[in-house]
Regions:
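Phosphate/pyrophosphate-binding catalytic cores of soluble transferases and nucleic-acid-acting enzymes
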Residues: 1-319
């Protein structure tokens, strides 16, 4: 059975994925699916570094501006949306290109991971949420570390949703969600995929992150968060727990100064980038690329297309 073709372009935040993805899509006749857990939200543009319409250069994008910030977004919903998008792209006669830095989301697509949604338990989850709200993020993160240290390494201590989900899974199944996900990763992929990861030197990456945050502030990040807050959104909304939004909310609530908020955004983004790199290094069948080893994006895309063509010779399905 012939597998569907899929190109993945991943990498840490600020590694240059957006511009490379556009050039690659134009070269190979691709359409882009965003694998970003924040860019799905309408009205959250500055803080997510969302691609602008003119920057798309006519390349169709999926999973951008598809939900209101009041709506929850999870990995199961993401999987369903991606499958639908891939089918539509195939009907259009194009190649799907999955682009983003959320490694767990990308992995869920590549290996069609089953998250056992039928084992959700509302009572247990509610109790864990109440415990989280009462005891705080650090307490619950330490609790997770004692239960499942592997999951704790890959989940930020402030990621309430994933911490609760990992603990809930253990309480229901008496098994570790990290082991379940690892077993799912060993499945054969339903896709004939090529997996590229942009991996610039850390010092350059961190400089780019700092510059990006400064640009966000200049482009109106504070105003964007203020508008969202005035619309009734708060830290209780999943959409407002993203980096950039939660820190500015703290500033608007008078908990920290603006300079402190900006510094926190930079620091938290650098930490996120480090976790993203660690995640991708655990993946298999990955082609790592230092984008700064190439004269320009055209040369970089030449290299990517060459790699795709080389694989084609070994796998006639990718034609």
């Amino acid at each position: 059975m012939t597998k569907d073709k899929l190109i993945i372009l991943a990498g840490p935040t600020a590694s240059g994925k957006t511009s490379v993805s556009i050039d690659l899509a134009k070269r190979i006749g691709g359409e882009i699916i965003s694998a970003d857990s924040m860019q799905v939200y309408r009205g959250m543009d500055v803080g997510t570094a969302k691609i602008k319409a003119d920057e798309m250069q006519g390349v169709k994008h999926y999973l951008i501006n598809v939900l209101d910030p009041t709506e929850d977004f999870n990995i199961v919903k993401f999987q369903d949306m991606v499958k639908y998008s891939i089918e539509e792209i195939r009907r259009n006669g194009h190649i799907p290109i999955l682009v983003g830095g959320t490694g767990f989301y990308i992995q869920s697509v590549i290996y069609d991971i089953d998250f056992d949604t039928q084992d959700d338990n509302g009572d247990i989850r509610k109790a864990l949420e109440e415990e989280y709200d009462k005891m705080g993020a650090n307490f619950m993160y330490e609790k997770l570390k004692k239960i499942d240290s592997v999951s704790a390494e890959n989940i930020h201590k402030n990621n309430k949703k994933r911490i609760i989900r990992a603990i809930e899974y253990f309480l229901i199944n008496n098994a570790l969600i990290s082991e379940h996900n690892e077993s799912q990763r060993k499945k054969d992929s339903p896709y004939d995929f090529r997996f590229f990861v942009l991996n610039p030197p850390r010092d350059i990456l961190y400089d780019r992150i700092n510059q990006r945050v400064d640009k966000m502030v200049d482009e109106g990040l504070v105003r964007e968060v203020k508008d969202l807050k005035n619309a009734g959104l708060s830290s209780a909304n999943i959409s407002m727990q993203g980096i950039g939004y939660k820190e500015i909310l703290e500033y608007l609530d008078g908990e920290i100064t603006l300079d402190e908020a900006i510094d926190n955004i930079k620091q938290n983004t650098r930490h996120m980038a480090k976790r993203q790199v660690t995640w991708f290094k655990r993946e298999k069948d990955v082609i790592y690329i230092n984008p700064f080893e190439f004269e320009n994006n055209e040369k970089l895309v030449d290299y990517m297309v060459e790699k795709i063509d080389m694989e084609r010779k070994d796998n006639e399905q990718f034609e």
